[in-house]
């Protein structure tokens, strides 16, 4: 195998390469030798034709080098070892290379699922420029002529070193030549002397002498030696029209010819170059890699969307790719829309079920089935908690989807601005816009920086507000409101940051300028209309304040009602004691008279002291009873005023809720009309799906409002019917049932009195006195029972309207006590009535006998 040259220079092409170099060294002056030594340390593309040649590599070394997504270390090591066997140092080609790593990085494009073949694919009628190739034979005159035509400032008798130095300076100035083009300077064995010389007419393909893009796309010279690889897509996009780019992509995707002559081995690159290229490929931005790799991708090996960015971007190279991207977005957001609609339907079901349970509860209370009413109340409370957690919300106003739609609107606005620029430059507005993500990257980076700064500032502000809340309790409500506002802003900023990495440019780029304008206007109209519908979990502030006042009044009603009940109990106890004392006093007076008539003066003295103590006790109890009655009357008046305030606030809340529901209904109807008009001319599949979900949510909201209105109208109609009945029968008191209950013991007392009167006339004085005391006691008890029944009836109405279960249970116990008292009185009256009738009959019979005897 031929030996290698100094500093890792490759061996000569043939066996006479060494002698030729030796002869050249002897013939050249010392200055030329010095230049030769200096040139030997230069990169390959800057060396002259008299310098050490580059040996041919074996076919094993020329194997295609593949790396899917990165450089393979095993293949790099294999290529490096084979290169050293041929006398090549893989690191020698990169010594003092004027091309930086950043310049080499964009040339490497990795496509997932495909293998990148590094090599030159020769096209028909093209050749690589001889300026950057090593002459392998004596036919270098054409190359010198082309070099003279390319750079008129250089003379034909200039040395190769000066020419190459000038070329190196131009490479440094341009800064866009890929490193692979500068460092790969080997010739394949199969395309050496066998390749015929290219005719001179092929030189006319170059239109620009200094375009490195044009030079890198040329074909090999007489020996077919190629230096470089296709230029970066960024350089081509600035110098070629879209038609030329399409033709070039088609030629790249065409069938390959002889792989030995048309593919360049990449095994001469060292591990350091591989690492640099891999690092640069990792550091490059994802949109740039995607845009660069799209023209080089095989039709059958197109990469799919990244699962982490599903719905955020796609391949905009064809209509099928566009539909695939929209389908991905639809698959991502359809579950969100479905969940929102399910929550709306569930809330409507909860509202309907609550109305039915309330009706059943009212029926149970009317039928005195309080156990059923208690069970229904528990179910109603559970439904109320579920209603609070489930609130109506437009799918398009859902936080994540609303943020995404805002991001889409921003992308559409950016595309519109670019389309306006293209329209001003005379481009066709109906053709899809070819977007360049690199132009939008600075704006995205700036907005990202601003959002992060804004979020940090908001977080600091929130912490400061928390400290102020702890220090200043007096300003708690104001600071909490501000804290809520900042929290919402933080959530909005975080939602905006969520879409910073989501590039919709490929999708937006598929729409024409007219379609972009329609989508932008539709987004603005629908977002503005949806913002007018107050889809919140709780009503407005005015209604909430009134509801809080009603709650406080309800608590006051409970407290006052409890006080009135306690005072009534105390009054009843005091009356009972006073009645007992009044029952004992006549008996003590009679006993005192008998003691005095029987000359039992010590007994009469004791009875007098007993009568005096009972009298003083009765006076004290009567004073206390009068005070309790005054206090009870005050509480009753206060209870009446609180009930009036409660009813007034209830009416005001109902009025506010009616107005609020009316406004919501009107705004919802307007939004539904807007959605129906937009759906007819919608060009965006995602927006069409979102608007359909919004339309369904609006229909559910209208149905729930109609259910509530129907329930309210039924309640109003029932109240009107009750008022009509009361107005049609004025002699009948409003509380007829309670009056009947109140009159029942009085009727019993009157009947007892009517039956008792004859017996009183016939009986003696002692019987008359006992009957009088009994009748007075029973009359007072009946009067107390009547008052108690009236009070219980008022409390029962209050409990029914306020759904106060505690008060209902208390009233149940009170009614049970009244029933027991009435039953005891009836049992007490029956024996007295029978005894009085028997005594009256006996006395009458005795009187008749005496008269007959007389």
Swiss-Prot record:
Residues 285-295 have a biased composition (Basic and acidic residues). Residues 1-24, 179-205, 221-257, 278-323, 716-739 are annotated as: Disordered. Residues 1-292 are annotated as: Interaction with MAP1A. Residues 598-854 are annotated as: Interaction with ATF4 and ATF5. One of its GO terms (molecular function) is identical protein binding. Interacts with NDEL1. Interacts with CCDC88A (via C-terminus); the interaction is direct. Interacts with GSK3B. Interacts with tubulin alpha, ACTN2, ANKHD1, ATF4, ATF5, CEP63, EIF3S3, MAP1A, NDEL1, PAFAH1B1, RANBP9, SPTBN4, SYNE1 and TRAF3IP1. Interaction with microtubules may be mediated in part by TRAF3IP1. Interacts (via C-terminal) with PCNT. Interacts with CHCHD6. Interacts with CCDC141. Interacts with FBXW7, the substrate-recognition component of a SCF (SKP1-CUL1-F-box protein) E3 ubiquitin-protein ligase complex; the interaction targets DISC1 for proteasomal degradation. Keywords: Chromosomal rearrangement, Coiled coil, Cytoplasm, Cytoskeleton, Developmental protein, Isopeptide bond, Microtubule, Mitochondrion, Neurogenesis, Schizophrenia, Synapse, Ubl conjugation, Wnt signaling pathway. This is Disrupted in schizophrenia 1 protein. Involved in the regulation of multiple aspects of embryonic and adult neurogenesis. Required for neural progenitor proliferation in the ventrical/subventrical zone during embryonic brain development and in the adult dentate gyrus of the hippocampus. Participates in the Wnt-mediated neural progenitor proliferation as a positive regulator by modulating GSK3B activity and CTNNB1 abundance. Ubiquitous. Highly expressed in the dentate gyrus of the hippocampus. Also expressed in the temporal and parahippocampal cortices and cells of the white matter. Residues 1-18 have a biased composition (Gly residues). Residues 296-309 have a biased composition (Low complexity). It is linked to A chromosomal aberration involving DISC1 segregates with schizophrenia and related psychiatric disorders in a large Scottish family. Translocation t(1;11)(q42.1;q14.3). The truncated DISC1 protein produced by this translocation is unable to interact with ATF4, ATF5 and NDEL1. InterPro entries: DISC1. GO terms for biological process: canonical Wnt signaling pathway; cell proliferation in forebrain; cilium assembly; detection of temperature stimulus involved in sensory perception of pain; microtubule cytoskeleton organization; mitochondrial calcium ion homeostasis; neuron cellular homeostasis; neuron migration. Residues 802-835 are annotated as: Interaction with NDEL1. Residues 446-854 are annotated as: Necessary and sufficient for interaction with PCNT and localization at the centrosome.
């Amino acid at each position: 195998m031929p030996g290698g040259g100094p500093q890792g220079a490759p061996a000569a092409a043939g066996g006479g390469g060494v002698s030729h170099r030796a002869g050249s060294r002897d013939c050249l002056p010392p200055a030329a030798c010095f230049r030769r030594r200096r040139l030997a340390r230069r990169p390959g593309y800057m060396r002259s034709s008299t310098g050490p040649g580059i040996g041919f590599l074996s076919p094993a070394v020329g194997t295609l080098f593949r790396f899917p997504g990165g450089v393979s270390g095993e293949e790099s090591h294999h290529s490096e070892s084979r290169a050293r066997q041929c006398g090549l140092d893989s690191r020698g080609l990169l010594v003092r290379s004027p091309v930086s790593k950043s310049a080499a990085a964009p040339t490497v494009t990795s496509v997932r699922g495909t293998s990148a073949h590094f090599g030159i694919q020769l096209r028909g009628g093209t050749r690589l420029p001889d300026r950057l190739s090593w002459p392998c034979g004596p036919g270098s005159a054409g190359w010198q002529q082309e070099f003279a035509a390319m750079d008129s400032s250089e003379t034909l008798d200039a040395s190769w070193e000066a020419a190459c130095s000038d070329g190196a300076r131009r490479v440094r100035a341009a800064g866009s030549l890929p490193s692979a083009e500068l460092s790969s300077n080997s010739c394949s064995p199969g395309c050496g002397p066998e390749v015929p010389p290219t005719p001179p007419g092929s030189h006319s393909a170059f239109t620009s002498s200094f375009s490195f893009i044009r030079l890198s796309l040329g074909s090999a010279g007489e020996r077919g030696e190629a230096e470089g690889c296709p230029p970066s897509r960024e350089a081509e996009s600035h110098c070629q029209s879209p038609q030329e780019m399409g033709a070039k992509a088609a030629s790249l995707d065409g069938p390959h010819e002889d792989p030995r002559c048309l593919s360049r081995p990449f095994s001469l690159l060292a591990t350091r170059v591989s690492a640099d290229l891999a690092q640069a490929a990792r550091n490059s931005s994802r949109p740039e890699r995607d845009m660069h790799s799209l023209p080089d991708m095989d039709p059958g090996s197109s990469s799919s969307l990244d699962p982490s960015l599903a719905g955020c971007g796609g391949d905009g190279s064809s209509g099928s790719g566009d539909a695939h991207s929209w389908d991905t977005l639809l698959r991502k957001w359809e579950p969100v829309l479905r969940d929102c609609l399910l929550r709306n339907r569930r809330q409507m079901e909860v509202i309907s079920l609550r109305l039915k349970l309330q009706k059943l509860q009212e029926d149970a209370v009317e039928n005195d089935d309080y156990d059923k009413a208690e069970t229904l109340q528990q179910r109603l409370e559970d439904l109320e908690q579920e209603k609070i957690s489930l609130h109506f919300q437009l799918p398009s106003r859902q936080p994540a989807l609303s943020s995404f739609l805002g991001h889409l609107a921003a992308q559409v606005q950016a595309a519109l601005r670019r389309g306006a620029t293209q329209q001003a430059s005379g481009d066709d507005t109906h053709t899809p816009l070819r977007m360049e993500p690199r132009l939008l990257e600075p704006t995205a980076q700036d907005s990202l920086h601003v959002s992060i700064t804004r979020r940090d500032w908001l977080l600091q502000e929130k912490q400061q507000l928390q400290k102020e809340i702890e220090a200043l309790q007096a300003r708690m409500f104001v600071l909490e409101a501000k804290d809520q506002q900042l929290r919402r802003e933080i959530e909005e900023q975080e939602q905006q940051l969520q879409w910073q990495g989501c590039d919709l440019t490929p999708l937006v780029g598929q729409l024409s300028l007219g379609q972009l304008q329609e989508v932008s206007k539709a987004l603005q109209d629908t977002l503005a209309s949806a913002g007018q519908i107050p889809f919140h979990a709780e009503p407005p502030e005015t209604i909430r304040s009134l509801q809080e006042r009603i709650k406080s009044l309800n608590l006051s009603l409970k407290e006052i009602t409890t006080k009135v009940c306690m005072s009534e109990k105390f009054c009843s106890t005091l009356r009972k004691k006073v009645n007992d004392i009044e029952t004992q006093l006549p008996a003590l007076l009679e006993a005192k008279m008998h003691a005095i008539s029987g000359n039992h003066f010590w007994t009469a003295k004791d009875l007098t002291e007993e009568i005096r103590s009972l009298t003083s006790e009765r006076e004290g109890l009567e004073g206390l009873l009068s005070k309790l009655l005054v206090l009870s009357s005050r509480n009753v008046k206060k209870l009446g005023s609180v009930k009036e305030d409660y009813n007034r606030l209830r009416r005001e809340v109902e009025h506010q809720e009616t107005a609020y529901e009316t406004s919501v209904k009107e705004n919802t109807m307007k939004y539904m009309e807007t959605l129906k008009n937009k759906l007819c001319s919608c060009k965006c599949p995602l927006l069409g799906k979102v608007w359909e979900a919004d339309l369904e949510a609006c229909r559910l909201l209208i149905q729930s409002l109609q259910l509530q209105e129907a329930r309210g109208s039924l309640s109003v109609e029932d109240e009107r019917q009750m008022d009509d009945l009361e107005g049609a029968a004025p002699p009948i008191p409003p509380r007829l049932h309670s009056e009947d209950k109140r009159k029942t013991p009085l009727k019993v007392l009157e009947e007892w009195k009517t039956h008792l009167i004859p017996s009183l006339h016939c009986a003696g004085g002692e019987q008359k006195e006992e009957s009088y005391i009994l009748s007075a006691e029973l009359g007072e008890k009946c009067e107390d029972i009547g008052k108690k029944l009236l009070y219980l009836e008022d409390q029962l109405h209050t409990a029914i309207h306020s759904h106060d279960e505690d008060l209902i249970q208390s009233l149940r116990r009170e009614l049970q006590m009244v029933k027991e008292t009435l039953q005891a009185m009836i049992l007490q009256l029956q024996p007295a009535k029978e005894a009085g009738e028997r005594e009256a009959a006996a006395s009458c019979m005795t009187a008749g006998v005496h008269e007959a005897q007389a």
